[in-house]
Amino acid sequence: MKSKRSTNKAIMKKYSQGSREAQEKQKNDKKNVPVLVITYFVIFIFIGMMVHLVKYVVVDADSDIANSYNKRQNLYAETVIKGQIISDDGVVLAETKTDDDGNETRVYPYSNMFAHAVGYDSNGQAGLEMVSNYYLLTSNQNILYRIYHALSDKKDMGNNVITTLDYDLQSTAYNALGDNDGAVVAIEPSTGKIKAMVSKPDFDPNQISSVIEETANSDSSCLLNRATQGMYPPGSTFKILTTLEYIRENPNYKSYSYECEGDGIFNSVSIHCYNHKVHGTVSLEDSLAYSCNTSFSNIGTKLDMDALNKLCGDFLYNKELPYDGYYKKSSYTMTSKTDKSLIPQTVIGQGETLITPLHNAMVMCAIANGGVLMKPYMMDRIENCDGSVVKKFSKDSYGRIISSAEAQTMTELMLSLIHI
């Protein structure tokens, strides 16, 4: 009996000890929870930092270094002779000449003709000289030559930038613009390749120091690239958007008819056609073909101005453009709340609407490419000094702007211009 009681006491004692141990363990576990949370949090942060570091090294580092605002690029010039800028058809547009004393001079063989597109590389930078500076100051020359140059204290040859620019098209556009101020932009709709970009007044990049000195206080500097930064009323080119909006709001648009008398009053505003020419009875197709101002002002009084505003937004008015160079945003302000007297002028591309030649070319390209806008670009590829391709720039779609059916309809209407 005594033995049994002793056994029970031992069991109770053991159970009591086990219970206390369990309670102690539970208390310790509760104390350890914050420590574990902090540990996992630190591990999570560490993993995140490693992922970010790997991403930067593999993906972002080159683009950051290539950024035109990165001043570290200038350090490359100490060991690399800046490469050439070459047209798509093989014409050298910019190169570095070195004299017997090792002095380097950036030379532009065609001076004014490519001034704004190619830019300059002295007293600052502009154009391709700025955008592609990193590539031009990077060398992928044969490794044996680079070792030899390092041992003999000579510079490596920089890579060459092959552009999308076409010499013949650029020359044609440059000569066609003549002595007029303005700009010409030619883009390949299916790819976004900029084939020509001319701006006037122009300048000689070989004489950039004197040009900057002479134009420092000018309100209309020849250094301004009017193709990307010049703001102009779109004029009759805007009638394409007015036409498209009318078609959207009027499925029976083919039955449209208007009697043009050469001038008219719309929303208390007097509008007249060019030279007050009387076009007579015109359809929608005729209105676009003859660029009939009175017919379009008549159309404008019937349109939903908010819908037209949205259409303009779809074509990137008031928005950022998918373009790497400097540019100004175009402006369109007309809504249903705007003074109605502005409608007749707005729908024919006058009034307060402003657009850059580059942007206007993009609008036309989207229509010509079945409603899809391709991002405009001017660098086709990077080659080393031996002609081997180092980097290729591919075409890139911004996205669909209008439906393919709408693009087809507008293309057919625009073709009527050549049949009048």
Located regions from the model:
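Periplasmic/cell-envelope proteins involved in peptidoglycan metabolism and beta-lactam response
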Residues: M1-I212, C222, M231, Y256, ...
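Beta-lactam-recognizing serine transpeptidase/beta-lactamase-like catalytic domain environment
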Residues: K2-R5, K9-S16, D89, H149, ...
